[in-house]
Amino acid sequence: MFSPPSLLHITMTTEKIDNISVTTQANVYFDGKCVSHGITFADGTKKSVGVVLPSTLTFNTGAPEIMECVAGSCEYKLAGTDAWIKSAPGEKFSVPGNSSFDIRVGEAYHYICHFG
């Protein structure tokens, strides 16, 4: 069942993540327009931190994701919707599992992707 997008407003972006293991080899997608590194917490929780450079891209999801903007901004559109929604620093948006979303970036968009 499709859940409508949720936009969570918070007052502060995540600036630092402690006590993690970092995958040193970058994940490079879309000819370098998106670059990320995987991180793993002591409890096994996985996230990725990265940047999307100016472009319009489509990402597919396996697990549900929460995208947290830490710098820059983007507009996103979830699969099955027509509206572009802006996400700025300190904001998050949710993407269902086994779905996709379009992202439109005019300036470098720095993010944390929370899986599951």
Segments the model singles out, each with a brief description of its role:
Residues 41-62, 94-97:
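Conserved short histidine dyad/triad with adjacent acidic residue
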Residues 60-62, 78-81:
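Short alpha-helix capping/helix-loop boundary micro-motifs
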Residues 81-98:
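Short acidic-glycine-tyrosine-enriched beta hairpin
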Residues 2-44:
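A short, N-terminal "cap"/entry segment at the start of jelly-roll beta-barrel domains
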Residues 31, 36, 49-53, 60, ...:
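Acidic, Ser/Thr/Pro
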Residues 62-75:
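Short, conserved beta-strand element in jelly-roll/cupin
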Residues 96-116:
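Ligand-binding loop in jelly-roll beta-barrel domains
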Residues 57, 72-77, 92:
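Short beta-strand segments in beta-sandwich/barrel cores
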